[in-house]
């Protein structure tokens, strides 16, 4: 865990700071170990429930990466058991959780900043429909790009990514 964040921290070459958060204390400990192993000095990991607003972070982030919990339907090659475990009601619960998290973390983006929404699923409800829901409820954002990658397209896992920009209002 933390691989994308570590990569971003390295690309910043010390010119910025990366704060990565996860609700799981165990995952945070793994991220901290990876930070040490990669000798990244401009990154910290914190245990935090993304549904809970951090008042001190509102309007301060140039970029928020919302890499949200999802059904994982884009990684069936690696985890084929998902198709047997995942039920329609599970996906509905995940969509509700994703929306709750988005409703909180978007506040951290400063005007002119960006929010990256990503999942490792190919489910439209968790992807395009969530972005449409978010845009209908947060007019201060605009979609800059949105892409669904299917597993057979690049020979990789399936995933979704949308880049949203907070307008200067």
Where are these regions (language model features)?
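S-adenosylmethionine
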Residues: 1-169
């Amino acid at each position: 865990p933390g691989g994308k964040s570590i990569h971003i921290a390295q690309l910043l070459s010390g010119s910025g700071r990366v704060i990565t958060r996860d609700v799981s204390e165990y995952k945070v400990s793994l991220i901290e170990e990876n930070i040490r192993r990669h000798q990244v000095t401009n990154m910290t990991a914190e245990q935090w429930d993304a549904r809970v607003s951090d008042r001190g972070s509102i309007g301060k982030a140039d970029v928020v990466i919302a890499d949200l919990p999802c059904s994982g339907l884009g990684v069936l090659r690696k985890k084929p058991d998902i198709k047997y475990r995942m039920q329609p009601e599970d996906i509905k619960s995940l969509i509700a959780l994703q929306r709750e998290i988005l409703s909180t973390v978007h506040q951290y983006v400063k005007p002119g900043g960006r929010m990256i929404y990503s999942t490792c699923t190919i489910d439209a409800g968790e992807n395009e429909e969530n972005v449409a829901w978010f845009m209908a409820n947060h007019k201060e954002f605009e979609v800059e790009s949105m892409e669904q990658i299917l597993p057979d397209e690049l020979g990789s896992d399936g995933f979704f990514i949308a880049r949203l920009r907070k307008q200067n209002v």
